[in-house]
Amino acid sequence: MTFSCLLALPLLSLLAALAPNPPKQLTYCNPINVDYGFCPIPNFVTQGKHRATADPAITMFKGDYYLFSTNQWGYWWSPDMLNWHFVPRKFLLPGANSYDELCAPAIWVMGDALYVIGSTYTDQFAIWKSTNPRVDDWHEAIHHFPVPAWDPAFFLDDDERLYLYHGSSNTFPTYGQEIDPTTFHAIGPKVELLTLHDDIHGWERFGEHGDNTFLRPFIEGSWMTKHDGKYYLQYGAPGTEFSGYGDGVYVSDHPLGPFTYQAHNPFSYKPGGFTRGAGHGATYQDAFGNWWHVSTITIAVKNNFERRNGIWPAGFDKDGVLFANTAYGDYPTYLPSQAGEDHAAGRFAHWMLLNYAKPVLASSTLGSHSPNFAVNEDMRTYWSAKTANQGEWFQTDLGAVSTVRAIQVNYADQDADVMGKQPGLYHQYRLLASIDGRRWTVIVDKSHNKTDVPHDYIELENPVQARFVKIENVHMATGKFALSGLRVFGLGPTAPPKPVQSFVALRADDQSGADRRSAWLKWQVSDDATGYVIYSGVAPDKLYTSVMVYGANEYYFTAMTKDRPYYFQIEAFNEGGISSRSAVLESK
């Protein structure tokens, strides 16, 4: 018996070694799935407690990605841009009287350390550094940083000179200043670098409709990137609450200017789709050297500062034009896998949304939070069950048996009772699939999950054939069982839609006196389309801006520079794929 066991042990080891490893997940889906903290500010939760963060920055350090964003009472690190590990940490000095624990943080690598500081209008904030940020191991680089800066960004140049960029105002400009990298005291005067010109640049106008209602627009969220000897000073505008919140960029041969407005602007922009907004972010490189842009996604329902984070493929074209590719940016997107990826072509996995506006059923409904709000591709609306009890459920009908490749479970905050970052929160659920709506198979079982997954995204190990998909609640992190989006991705049995017809761009001419910063885009309804993606740009081969449109055959495009010609294309999409694009349309 002993001899048999000894023989069995090597055999078991061999079988274990030969057993295939679980498939590595290849895609992610925005908003990124991290355990977002809840708003910690009492005045901001009068209409309901809710998760909130924004103003993200990512940098690589010692082979890992580090993500910091506003008021999370900590930060995340990841080895792969998919699995993010939270490190609890508060950076305010003892005695500080502020709810803004780490607002719009700046992060940069200098020497063998990662540095961080939050926004402050005083000189009472420390700069912290760590050589081992995978854990809470931080030390003061300077106890009181003597240069007050809101929305700060630090940039270390190739010659080891350090620069600070900052500003968040609808009155004052973006400033720049050289900082001593040893003492962290200012070198030379503060320089005015950028201001908004919303009379020329349409996207810089304040308001959801770009009409400067209520306030003048804000310039904020500085970030500096150096590429091929050029300095790209990035900024957010016009307001974090709006779908058109984006990032623009100016370019210079010197770190403190003078700067020239890039013709393609905003370079990061996502005014349509499930997630909206792509402003106040940071541009960084992955482990293979490819460029990405992380930025703020707006919700702004329970408070103007209810937001999430998104990551978009980015890059520089052959002419040095900085772009971020947000086309299908909230659909499954391939993670980085090798050097030289074509981010202008995008990283979209071509798994289509299968359940937009399709029939739904639910176990119960709370008030006006009706079930269709979980399939309408608007993260600002949501379905809520009456309780958080185990057994509450939500079901979506795909309309036809389809190939399901991935599912995103977006929870909403209904009657949450948490403020700030609270450890120990977790979601538990099961996902089931059915061909006929009667016989069900569990395809994802997270009934024993112990992590907080507010925007959980599951790439199935093997595609599933299904017409119906159901989620059953087991445990909620807080509040009632509520979903802003149960999004099912894959391919349906239908053919891709036919090309869009009768696409026109209506724009005022120079003599009309009407507003040339906007265009009215119209096209013929495609009966076989779920939605449309419009591409625009300042040259026929630089259509880097995209807008996703559902349920309409027109769009008011308000992001144009007044005296510049623009070029447009459009394509339709449905559950079966994407049509060919229309001919390029010039709008002078």
Functional labels for PLM-detected ranges:
Residues F557-S579:
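Beta-strand-rich modules
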Residues V464-A466, A529, D563-P565:
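Extracellular Ig-like/FN3 beta-sandwich strand-entry sites
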Residues N376-V442, P454-A508, S512-A514, K522-Q524, ...:
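Aromatic, loop-rich ligand-recognition surfaces of beta-strand-rich domains
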Residues K450-H455, M548-Y555:
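Short, solvent-exposed loop/turn segments in extracellular or other extracytoplasmic domains
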Residues Y175-I187, E341-E377:
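Predominantly extracellular/luminal regions of secreted and cell-surface proteins
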Residues L432-A433, V525-G551, Q569:
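Extracellular low-complexity, O-glycosylation-prone stalks/linkers
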Residues A19-F214, K226-G273, F288, T296-E341:
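Beta-rich carbohydrate-recognition and catalytic domains
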